[in-house]
Each structure stands twice: as C-alpha cells, then as structure tokens.
Amino acid sequence: MGIKKYFFYLILFFVCKSSFAQQNHDTIYINNQFYIKHIVKYGENIDNISKFYDVSVKKILETNETSTKLFVGQSLYIPFENESVKSNYIKSNKKYKIALLLPFYKNLNDTLVASFEDKEEAEDIILGKSKMALEFMQGVEFALDSIEKLGIEIHLNVIDTRNDSAKMIEVIKSRVLDTMDLIIGPIYSRNMDLVSKKYGNDKSKTLISPLSKSSEFLKNQISTVQINTPFKNQSRIISDFIEEKYNSKDIIICYDENEKGLALFMERKLNKSSNNIIKMNMIYTHIDSIRDQFLDTQIVILPSNNRAFVSRMLGTLGGIDSVFTVFGLSNIKNYDHLDIENLMHLDVHFPDPYYFNQHIKKDSIFLYGFEEKFFLTPSRFSFVAYNIMMHFCVDEMRYDFDKFRMNSGKVNINASLVRYENYFLERAKN
C-alpha cells in the first residue's frame, strides 16, 4: 500500500457534559480536522446525533460512508468545527514507568557489522532476528506520540533481552525493574516465566506478555496479563459461534494423537444434544484414505497447533468434493504457505486476538498515521505494540480480559472470529 500523504495521527479525549453521551469520546485529529468518535446507543438515530453535535446529516453520512440506518454499537466519526470544543479536551497528569523487554540481539548485530569492510554497507545490515523487536519498538514509538500529547508522562526503559535466560536473570538481579509500573515482555515464554516469578504478584505492576501462546507464567501470578488468547478461550469462542449459527449440524473433530486433549476439550464445549459430534484420530491424512469418512455437508474442527498436521488436513479437505465449514485456531493466520483460495473454498474460520482491518476507521487511522511517520506499512508486531500502549496507558479498550483461573493472571478474550473473504480477513457474521 502506498504512503498516504497529508495525514497525521493524534488521540485526544473529549468528555460530553450532556446526558446524551456520558462516556469519554475519542477525539481524532487528521489533516487539520477534528473527529469525535461516537458509539451509537439504543434509541439514537442519525437525526438526533446530528442535532447533538450540530453537524449536518449529510456531512456525517459522507464522512462515515454509511446509510441513515444505524445499529447499536456502531462507531461514527463526527467532523467537528466548533473551536470551543477543539480546546476542551482532558490533559492527564498520569505518569508511567515502562520497561520494554525485547530481543534486539545488539551484541550479535555489533559483531555482524564489525565483519564488514565497507562500513557504509554495514550500517544497512540488521540481523534478521532483530526485525520483530524493531517493528514492535516502532509501534511503541508511534503510540508515544499520541500518549504524550495527552499530557501523560512516560518514562520508557528499553532493555535488550537477547532472548537469553542468563541475560534476563542479570536484568532481574540489577533491580532495574523494581520501580516499573508496566513491564511489556519478554517475548519468549521461558524468559517471561523468569520475570513472572519475580514480579508476578507485585500489585504495583502489570506484566504483559504480548505474543506468547504459553500461559504457564499466569499461574498463581495475579499481576500478569496475556494478550494472545489461549486455546481454551478460543474453543469457547468457536463453540459459542457454532451453537448460534450451526445448531443441529453434523460436526467432525479431526485431531492428531499428540493433541487428543485439545479435541476432548473442544468436544466438551459443544452441545451434544443439538449436534451430531464425531471425533476422528487422523492417523492418515491422505485424501484417498479419508475421503469416505466425510459427509456432503459438514462442520470440521481442527483443534491443533501442529503446523504440519493443519496444513495437510486443509490440503486434503480442499480436494474432497464436499461443502465444508472449517474451524481452526489462531495459528492458522501465521502459516504463510497456505493457499488463501483454498481457505476461502473451505470457509475456514479462526479466532484472531490481533485482528486488523484497514477498512475499519480505527485501524485505518492507525495505518495512515504510521505510514506518515515511518514511510512504511506497519507489521502486525507494530500494531500489537501500539494497541498495548493505548490500552494500558490511555485506557482505550483494545482488549477484554478474564481470569485465567483463581489466584492467577488474566487472559485476553477479545479475539474476533474471522474468515477470508475476497482475499481479506473479515469478521465472521453470526
């Protein structure tokens, strides 16, 4: 996607004093224009929203590319011209000390650069392992632009973990983390476990695991948070959707023997009284071996984190002359070798805790602002970092958390169920 000119991004807050809208509204500034984000509530219509903000119906409809038929929960972006309103936003006196623990591998990069005779060429060389950390850091930096304009004071301490347990122990012993309010990272689970054991029950802190699938660090650690939605929570999202949309359908749960426990858990979550459920241990995944075991129309669930197994099953199902709706886990999104046309053909659904859609106003504003600042398209790591900063520093509700278990940390349960439509990920409709 090309660089979008003339856009820049600024998050502000505006508090409406009328009983018509008693919650904070995001106020967004794009290309010298203020927009107030309004969430449509029960009983509201385009006319009374227009009167409240003193903005014409035509202007609201043009800005949001919508019709006069609104629905509860819909986000509208209201263009605002009133000078008194522009200056009436809240400046915060909040302060945060934040530790960002990322694997930059600076030591390895220094060694790599030193090996080049041409120092100008060496400056452009970055060890591939560092790419994720650098992209994550860009998301944090972009969020800081907005956060600091709100008057929120951020003291950021960036620490290179090198993805090395010995280095992480050294950081913990240094006590540099003792005074932090937020600890973001480490990225990898074994290092997250070390930090959690030291600070996981410190009520003055929040420890955030941004990417890891492992939930071990949450156990008996009440100040910990996991952004990547765990399997059991993904199972609930899938089962709730199936029971609402595909009640009384034939369901087959295909699993690898090593992941039988995942299949059993998924089976328990589904309503056996209204669905015919079959579990199948897929010892063989070749099309000729399993073709006869599937019906003409069927719901297929692949509760697996095994890349090879999921890939083989999707390839095999794509070659069977039946109509399937397939449900899998969020890891499907990371398998970049999969054929999107086959995913569309199989109507593959999966929960996505990191869902991004450039056609959604909130996400498009992030995209345009990021491109304006860095002259490149943001990666998913930049988007995750930005959302974490905005959620925990600005109280923008990017996530929804629930207890992992009693006396433990919290997990993100806001994972949209998505499917590919016209080669783009879209939210699945009930």
Please annotate each region the language model reported.
Residues I184-G185, R190-N247, I251-C254, K260-M266:
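Extracytoplasmic ligand/sensor domains, especially the bilobed periplasmic-binding protein
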Residues N107-K131:
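A solvent-exposed, charged loop/short amphipathic helix patch at secondary-structure junctions
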Residues F375-N430:
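Segments of small-molecule ligand-sensing domains
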Residues I154-S174, S235, I283-F294:
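Structural motif
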Residues T179-Y188, I208-P210, D250-D256, L295-M313, ...:
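Periplasmic-binding protein-like
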Residues M1-Y29, R419-N430:
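Bacterial Sec-dependent N-terminal signal peptides
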Residues L314-V384:
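Extracellular/periplasmic periplasmic-binding protein-like sensory domains
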Residues Q23-S56:
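Primarily a LysM-type cell-wall glycan-binding module
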